[in-house]
């Protein structure tokens, strides 16, 4: 399998901008790491709502979906992810909608609330129900402990891993 056939979708659900900023940082770090490799693989970044009608096209062993999503209100999806979530969670969807698609979810939340990282947990569960392949275990980032250090640890681990997957011949 050529790396030129591989696609990384970095998608986010963000209420206050933290998840979007993390997603864009992740995108930039991946792009910087593969620069000069000669690879023409595709790496993009969009809010989850922009993927509502196209996520069924992710169904491919050549696709990797990296989700960064915060939880808002009483365990709810952020405004730029709520339409996606309504569609994505429908039980009428075929179980193999995302067959062989790799995924990793980073959920942002605050452990002072009962539904800590609820959206990240729900998205992670739903990807699994739709026959996706975990690329990495769920990462729950606790805003009560400060985001920066936790996010840095995640990025230091996942970026090289994504690059190895992208550039694997």
Ranges and model annotations:
Residues 2-7, 12, 17-18, 32-33, ...:
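FMN-binding flavodoxin-like domain, especially the glycine-rich phosphate-binding loop
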Residues 23-27, 124:
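A generic structural signal for short, well-ordered alpha-helical segments in conserved domains
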Residues 45-54:
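Short acidic loop-to-helix transition motifs that present clustered carboxylates
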